[in-house]
Structure formats: structure tokens, C-alpha cells
Amino acid sequence: MVLSAADKTNVKGIFAKIAGHAEEYGAEALDRMFTTYPQTKTYFPHFDVSHGSAQIKGHGKKVAAALVEAANHIDDIAGTLSKLSDLHAQKLRVDPVNFKLLGQCFLVVVAIHHPAALTPEVHASLDKFLCAVGTVLTAKYR
């Protein structure tokens, strides 16, 4: 998915607003995903997936860091997330659909916290960005 100049501006703008809360939002998105799509818990058998657990917060921090890095290097998402793509494809073998589910949950969290900032245009740009991240993370699956 190709991000236009306007999309890139919108994504950078929304990430500037959420930057101070990225870890919190990452954990909220994971919590929402585990609640809404309980089948996603199968990839975390060693986690306490209860609301607010330290493990959800810790993994949410990793998710947020990856998204922030991708937004900061929006012109090279593939290069930025290459190692993470290798990890998910070759070692963790996460079902690719889960990236889409997590992206949807992240969008909801952003909408909850920044409803005025998530205009239809920004929503579309953020959705395209999250789809691009998901595509990169699944590119090395065979």
C-alpha cells in the first residue's frame, strides 16, 4: 500500500499527538485485541493476559515502539521493521491476520483518546499506515 504525501503528514501528525502515550495505547490495543478476538491469546500462552497485567504492558510497549519507529521512518517501513518481520515469520509464526486485528484495535484506541484529531482523512491515513506495517511484518512468511 502506497502512502501519499498527505498520508505521511497525517500519520506523523497523529503520532506526534500520541507520542507521550504510545506505551499506554499499545497495551490498551493488546488488551482490546485479546478481549475482542480471544483466539489471539493462543500466541501468548506464557502471558498473564488479564487486563492491566505487567506482561500486556510490557508487550504493549514493544508494539508501540515498533509503530513509533515505523512512523519515524515512514519512507522505509520495510527496512525499519525487517528484523521484527523475520522474528514473526520465522520464529513466532504468528497468523498474519492478527496484525490486521491489532491494527484495528490500535485505531479504536486512538479514536477513544483523540476523537477530534481522528478526522476521516487521518483515520484513512492511519489505517493505510497500519496496513502497510502489517504487510511488512508478513512479507517474509512462506
Swiss-Prot record:
PROSITE patterns: GLOBIN. Red blood cells. Residues 2-142 form the Globin domain. It holds the Pfam family Globin. One of its GO terms (biological process) is hydrogen peroxide catabolic process. GO terms for molecular function: haptoglobin binding; heme binding; iron ion binding; organic acid binding; oxygen binding; oxygen carrier activity; peroxidase activity. O2 binds at H59. The keyword Iron-sulfur does not apply. Gene3D superfamilies: Globins (1.10.490.10). Heme b binds at H88. One of its GO terms (cellular component) is hemoglobin complex. Keywords: Heme, Iron, Metal-binding, Oxygen transport, Transport. Heterotetramer of two alpha chains and two beta chains. Involved in oxygen transport from the lung to the various peripheral tissues. Belongs to the globin family. This alpha-A chain is from the major component, which has been called the Q-II component. This is Hemoglobin subunit alpha-A. It comes from Coturnix japonica. The lineage of its organism: Eukaryota, Metazoa, Chordata, Craniata, Vertebrata. The gene is HBAA.
